[in-house]
Amino acid sequence: FHLSSALKAANAYKKKGTSATLIFQYLFLLIFSSRSMYMNLLIGKDTPDFAKDTVYRFMKMLQINWIRFTTILSSRIIKDAIVPLDSADRANVLIIDDSMFERNRSKKVELLAKAYDHAKHCYKFGFRMLTLGWSDGSTFLPVNSILLSTENKKNRVNDAKEVDKRTVGYKRRMLAVEKGTIAMLELLKSAKKADIPAKYVLFDSWFSSPSSLHSVKEIGYDVIAMVKKTPKMFFRYHDEDMPLTTIYNKNKKRRGRSRYLLSVKVDVVKDGIIIPAKVVYVRNRNKRNEYLCIMSTDVNLSEDEIIRIYGKRWDIEVFFKVCKSYLNLSKECKSMSYDAMTAHTAIVFTRYMMLSLESRESNDTRSMGELFLYFSDEMSDITWIQAFQMLLQMFRTLLADHIDISNEKIDELVDAFMDAIPILLKSKLQAA
């Protein structure tokens, strides 16, 4: 998928010294060695041809647009490897959600903030990793992300360092202190510019508001989202503005074991502009006496189709779990630089793209975690086999230099040695 050209398009290149592609490749493969860069340098194993300072300078480069890099790479994978194999009527979606990027034990990290973790219902030090992903219902690919600090200066532990205002790094820092709904629109615009094929944008109630629905619609996507049952948010129903709870109480519900309780058409009004929408009230499985509201700006979709498409939003939750449990998201990078943390996030996203694509192309029933462990074992085998082959080549060279023996005889000795080793080891060496 032309990784080097994607890096170059994102301004990740060097005029001299080690190429950016080699440094990125080293960081990409680091997780599969089960050791950090520090431990590799300490024990002298799997050490690169460049110093650690080269890696740190690369990750702190201000001019690299990591949002653009992951967007371009995911766009190429989607267009070249996934969409051609999908049916034309499949509903491809973009999914927006955030997750905690924890730095609880840090004090001097750039733009560090006290953020609320909605999953654990407590405040933590770190960032909100706002992520945009793509899914066709079978394969999920991360598209881009931004590490959000907070627009509230009281909750911000450290401010951004002074950088050149013309650089991508400065724009990245300015976006980090914007509201999540504004940052979400920037990520969607980046995906739209890359022409990623998707018709709907899915998000939960944290991002749902009439303003957000209008903004996403202006970019060119329909929205299917969960909406809060708050008395402060109004929608126009029968020429009257009212909250969703009032609309629910005014209508007769469906009886029996139906997938939904009620379906109504409303108008989403913002600054005099009206967008027609359909609201589907579904029963809350966790609390049977309560209901949830799913809204779609595509009123031509059936209620069952709205519920089915919104179910694809769960893919991004699986993505967050795999990245944190297996791909060392936030654990591998302890840098205090905001640019380095952004680079680390892009590298983790690229690793997940590889796992996701491998799972799809191999028609593999294994989970992402199982695939990760498989690749880790495979990397260990390759390293060991390379060392064994080097020893075998040195043995052949010593025989040729110090003993008067023909090449045919050396081949016979090597073949006899290979026949004498265990079958399992022999099969791995022959496969290599």
Regions inferred by a protein language model and the residue ranges of each:
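Alpha-helix initiation and N-capping motif
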Residues: 20, 35, 52, 66, ...
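Short, amphipathic alpha-helical segments that act as regulatory/interfacial helices
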Residues: 23-28, 129, 347-355
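Short N-terminal helix-initiation segments at or just after the protein's N-terminus
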Residues: 27-42, 68-77, 133-139, 293-296, ...
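Active-site-proximal, Lys/Arg-enriched surface segment
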Residues: 11, 61-152, 264-265
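Gly/serine-rich nucleotide phosphate-binding loop at the start of the catalytic core
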Residues: 1-68
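Short, contiguous clusters of charged residues that form electrostatic/catalytic patches at enzyme active sites
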Residues: 24, 127-130, 182-189
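Single, function-defining residue in the core of a domain
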Residues: 1-13, 70, 89-90, 107, ...
